[in-house]
């Protein structure tokens, strides 16, 4: 551990996720009013559609051409958020440790965010990471990855919230 991983996500020594010792838990998730058909689209199109879907907590309110690391800012509730959708059917994500690495690699963009434009640290005190998945049962390995990702987020001042499409 501590060596650079093949996908570019680097872990600090002592930050390994002792994957075998994680107890799998079926994570509680919230269903979004987004049709399952979004999963038939390309990754980029799916992400854009999910983050532009009206009346959902994951709806982007920041300009995507300017804000790459966060997609949501609430000045009244003092939080920033990043939404990430992942297709759990992808062969690569059947491997729980690869699934976890991909989540953490993306989450580091939110973790590293402090200020941009008029969004400065004095205007928010919470960071949310909205992970959007298909509405289907996760494998034991994927459940372990979500548990580890939630713990990782918590250690780094982030609240991971899990959502599913219809």
Predicted region positions:
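Hydrophobic, gly/ala-rich membrane-insertion helices/peptides used by toxins and envelope proteins
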Residues: 1-23
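Secretion-targeting segments and adjacent low-complexity export tracts
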Residues: 78-82
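Surface-exposed polar/charged interaction patches
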Residues: 7, 11, 15, 53-56, ...
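Catalytic cores of nucleic-acid endonucleases
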Residues: 60-67, 84-158
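A generic structural motif
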Residues: 156-166
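Residue-level detector of intrinsically disordered/flexible regions characterized by low predicted structural confidence
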Residues: 14, 20-23, 129, 138, ...
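Acidic-basic catalytic patches of nuclease active cores, encompassing PD-(D/E)XK
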Residues: 17-68, 73-76
């Amino acid at each position: 551990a501590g060596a650079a991983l093949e996908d570019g996500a680097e872990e600090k020594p002592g930050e390994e996720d002792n994957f075998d010792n994680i107890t799998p838990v079926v994570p509680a998730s919230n269903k979004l009013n987004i049709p399952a058909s979004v999963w038939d689209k390309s990754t980029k199109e799916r992400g854009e559609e999910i983050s532009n879907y009206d009346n959902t907590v994951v709806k982007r309110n920041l300009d995507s051409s300017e804000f790459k690391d966060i997609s949501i800012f609430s000045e009244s509730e003092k939080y920033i958020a990043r939404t990430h959708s992942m297709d759990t059917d992808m062969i690569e994500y059947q491997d729980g440790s690869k699934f976890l690495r991909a989540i953490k690699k993306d989450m580091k963009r939110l973790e590293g965010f402090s200020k941009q434009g008029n969004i400065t640290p004095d205007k928010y005190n919470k960071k949310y990471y909205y992970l959007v998945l298909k509405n289907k049962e996760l494998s034991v390995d994927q459940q372990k990855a979500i548990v580890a990702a939630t713990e990782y987020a918590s250690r780094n001042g982030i609240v991971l919230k899990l959502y599913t499409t219809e």
